[in-house]
Amino acid sequence: MATIPVLPVSDTLKEVKGGCILRTLDRRHFYAVQTPQVFPREVILTAYRQAKRFGTVGTDDAALVEAAGFPVQIIEGERSNIKITYPDDLLYASVFLKSIQHTK
């Protein structure tokens, strides 16, 4: 089965439109998704084929698997599994790595 690691969201989440807050979302129902994500070979291949065929766009592989109709289960992620997306993330990761090296 498709499986992804997640962490409960700790930030307050707001739905915004036109620069104004529409509502505050209940963060108990939201999770931050991590990698690595694990999929049976045929599931991920089918998901990508369908995404190409229908023009489906996803921000991660799991979104494409969901869109293709496959179930995706979650497991508890790890806070130290830092996602590197923006240049500032590299600085944060560097500081984190130095801090754990000093504790060993």
Say what each PLM segment does.
Residues M1-A32, V38:
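Anionic-ligand binding region
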Residues Y31-K104:
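Conserved alpha/beta core of the MobA/IspD/sugar-nucleotide pyrophosphorylase nucleotidyltransferase superfamily
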